[in-house]
Design a protein with these regions (language model features):
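Phosphate/oxyanion-binding active-site loops and adjacent basic polyanion-contact surfaces
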Residues: 75, 95-106, 136
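Short hinge/gating elements
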Residues: 63-64, 84-96, 122-125
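Short glycine-rich phosphate-binding loop at a beta-alpha junction
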Residues: 118-131
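Short, low-complexity, polybasic intrinsically disordered segments
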Residues: 134-149, 154
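Early-domain small/polar-rich strand-loop-helix modules and first-structured segments
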Residues: 1-88, 153-162
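Gly/Ser/Thr-rich loops at beta-strand to alpha-helix junctions
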Residues: 16-18, 129-137
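Phosphate/ATP-binding catalytic cores across multiple sugar-kinase/actin-like superfamilies
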Residues: 101-117, 162
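Surface-exposed acidic, glycine-flexible loop patches that form ligand/cofactor-binding
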Residues: 1-3, 115-120
């Protein structure tokens, strides 16, 4: 007989400097916040992407921050602000919509609990931002399908609600 899996809820608190991800299942007493380094208590993930020059390889968070100290990558910061402003970002010869880069960052952050072996796939994502606005909601609704989420699986709240 197949064992029923508890749904997995991911929560990402994001601003222009950092993101933090937690997950929760109904069989847990409280959510667990995930570190990018197993066993570490450092939970803040820099909201940053870095693309290796001449390649399609993207780094995020602390890896992007470390790689930024070399000349091997081109960094993109302020992902949330750029996406809300509707910016286009030029990286080498390629132009990217900032919301697409924010979606890439969020996808990489969402994969973190699974990579660390903590949880299977996400059933529902809750994003928490400092303040909700029409502009950031438009960006997030555009991003949801890129993350493989339907409107029923995706929610955005502000810090007052969280």
């Amino acid at each position: 007989m197949e064992q029923r899996r508890e749904p997995v809820y991911l929560g990402i608190d994001i601003n222009d400097r950092y993101a933090m991800i937690s997950y929760y299942q109904l069989n847990m007493s409280e959510p667990e916040t995930v570190s990018t380094i197993a066993g570490s208590e450092v939970f803040q993930i820099p909201t940053l992407l870095a693309k290796r020059k001449g390649m399609g390889q993207w780094y995020y968070g602390d890896d992007a921050k470390k790689m930024a100290k070399t000349s091997e990558v081109i960094c993109v910061d302020s992902l949330l602000k750029r996406a809300v402003n509707g910016d286009t970002v030029r990286v080498e010869e390629e132009s990217y919509e900032a919301w697409e880069l924010l979606a890439l960052f969020l996808k990489k952050v969402m994969d973190l609990p699974t990579k660390l072996g903590n949880v299977p796939v996400c059933d529902r994502l809750i994003l928490s931002v400092e303040r909700l606005s029409k502009e950031n909601m438009e960006v997030f609704w555009k991003i949801a399908p890129k993350l493989g989420l339907s409107q029923e699986q995706f929610m955005v709240i502000d810090h007052k609600e969280s």
